[in-house]
Amino acid sequence: MKKFTAKTIKLPKDVDEKYSQMNYLKEISKNIGDIKDGEKDDFVMFGHIEPLYLKNCIKHFESLPENITNFIIKNYDVNKFNLIGQILQSKHPMIFQTFTQVMNGNIISLGCEFALHKKLFEEYYNWHVSVIADLMGGIPADVPVTKEEMTIINDILFTTYWICYGNVNKGSIFVV
């Protein structure tokens, strides 16, 4: 997997029409040059996602309500997530490190937008699918994984990809 670099851009609070989707993509993708109108289809917009960040990385987190972290800590089946942790630890140690941080409440979610060149999106997607397949292959069929739990797993996977294989060049993390 290639190692990428990226930049994080803080949006102004008074975002208005000038941040239409096209301008949005141009703004967050300056590290690969301006996107011409005809190149719009070369990029994938994730829309609104919620990757996870280390709680103490940014002072702004201090003002976030505790219930954001508490949701992650309290609202999951301990045995099920222990099982998921065991699968990750044996097959994907890097992801397991991020997983442990989430389960310990050291990581919280923050909404952001993400634009990625299609080629890199394919790499992320294929990696993500392979990890999910490993997880689902290790969880017994009679242990259902809820939508909320899958959301947490997906956030952990995206975060791990961003930390380990990102900070994704030719696409940028856009903190809002």
Where do the model's predicted regions map?
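ER/Golgi luminal nucleotide-sugar-dependent glycosyltransferases, focusing on the catalytic module
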Residues: 1-176
